Amino acid sequence: LSDERWRSRDNAFENEVADHLANRFPTSASKSSYRFPSLRARQLAQLRTVLQAEPLSSRLAPSCDARRVRAKLVQDLPGIGPKQASMFMRNVGASYDVAILDVHVLSFFQRIGLLTVSGSAVSTLKTYEKTETVANAYAVRCGHPVGYLDWAIWITMRAAKELEA
């Protein structure tokens, strides 16, 4: 989809996006298609409208609290959960004060006895923040920012999983 097409405001946009997402990706080794193309197309169409009203740059004011910004992103942006919002903030350099709690990090915390929850148990912002509090406390004990610690844990656990296979 071209930038011009992305900016257009007609109702056919959602259908066009769904068609693109439903097609198989020729560059993919598995030749797989996108999961839930209609839902993702609807979310992208809604997201487009939301971002046209208030661009991301204005949502990421430097003086804002990272957790508050993440909560606002989750609340306002369709299809964006706490992990995705945290990853976005990290990738644009907005904050290393939020944790990215993926399956590898959660598995590590389970192995060392800090958590008993599964990955699906942190899908809401409330449970994500509760689990993030555990990650933050562990990061403080280790003497590193949570944004660097979760990265190191992710790399270590990913390598360990490959060794176990």
State where each predicted segment sits.
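Alpha-helical ds-nucleic-acid-binding substructure associated with the helix-hairpin-helix region
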Residues: S2-P78
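C-terminal accessory module of base-excision DNA glycosylases/AP lyases that mediates lesion recognition
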Residues: R40-R48, L56-A165
